Amino acid sequence: MGKDRNLSLNSPESIQSVIGDTDIKIAVIAAMWHEKIVRGLIDGATREIVSSGSHAELFRVPGSVELVLACKKLLKTFDAAVALGVILRGETDHNTHIARLVLSGITDVMLALEKPIGIGVLTIDTEQQGLDRSSGDYNAGVNAARAVIRMVRLFR
């Protein structure tokens, strides 16, 4: 019987046993806004990808909206992508519209190309929330990378 493909995203020790040595190529696409937070997401995602035996290549885009087009173009030559960014609440509801646009766009790309995209786009109220979710025990970049690796493996 095949390997168990329903492992929890919260079990880092299991990723190597599920994936092993692979040739998975993953584009890590990160927005440039809120660099300190995004850097934590990048570090977590790339560390997770490399530790699985997969290949990570980093691409930077101006902001979270640009993640959508970058995912679409890069998925022509990559097996999967991890999209990383930060959308910080301001004094208006602009962040809500941007978040919807980005998440809807990424989902549309994923479904159209039938390739997985791990979403590590944080929608936060404060910078501290972003720092908390991009480091330590809960790093959204790590979780996005784990999810995308498992999805690639599921469909191989």
Swiss-Prot record:
Q: Which reaction does it catalyse?
A: (2S)-2-hydroxy-3-oxobutyl phosphate + 5-amino-6-(D-ribitylamino)uracil = 6,7-dimethyl-8-(1-D-ribityl)lumazine + phosphate + 2 H2O + H(+)
Q: Which InterPro entries match?
A: LS, LS/RS, LS/RS_sf
Q: In which pathway does it act?
A: Cofactor biosynthesis; riboflavin biosynthesis; riboflavin from 2-hydroxy-3-oxobutyl phosphate and 5-amino-6-(D-ribitylamino)uracil: step 1/2
Q: Which domain of life is it from?
A: Bacteria
Q: Name one GO molecular function term.
A: 6,7-dimethyl-8-ribityllumazine synthase activity
Residues reported in the UniProt entry to bind (2S)-2-hydroxy-3-oxobutyl phosphate: 91-92, 133
Q: Which residues bind 5-amino-6-(D-ribitylamino)uracil?
A: 33, 64-66, 86-88, 119
> What's in the keyword line of the UniProt record?
Riboflavin biosynthesis, Transferase
- GO CC entries: cytosol; riboflavin synthase complex
Q: What is its EC number?
A: 2.5.1.78
**Which Pfam family is one of those matched by this entry?**
DMRL_synthase
Q: Which NCBIfam families does UniProt cross-reference here?
A: lumazine-synth (TIGR00114)
> Which family, according to the similarity comment?
Belongs to the DMRL synthase family.
- Functional description taken from the UniProt entry: Catalyzes the formation of 6,7-dimethyl-8-ribityllumazine by condensation of 5-amino-6-(D-ribitylamino)uracil with 3,4-dihydroxy-2-butanone 4-phosphate. This is the penultimate step in the biosynthesis of riboflavin.
Protein name, entry field = 6,7-dimethyl-8-ribityllumazine synthase
Q: Which organism is it from?
A: Tropheryma whipplei (strain Twist)
The organism that produces this protein has a lineage beginning with:
Bacteria, Bacillati, Actinomycetota, Actinomycetes, Micrococcales
Q: Which gene encodes it?
A: ribH
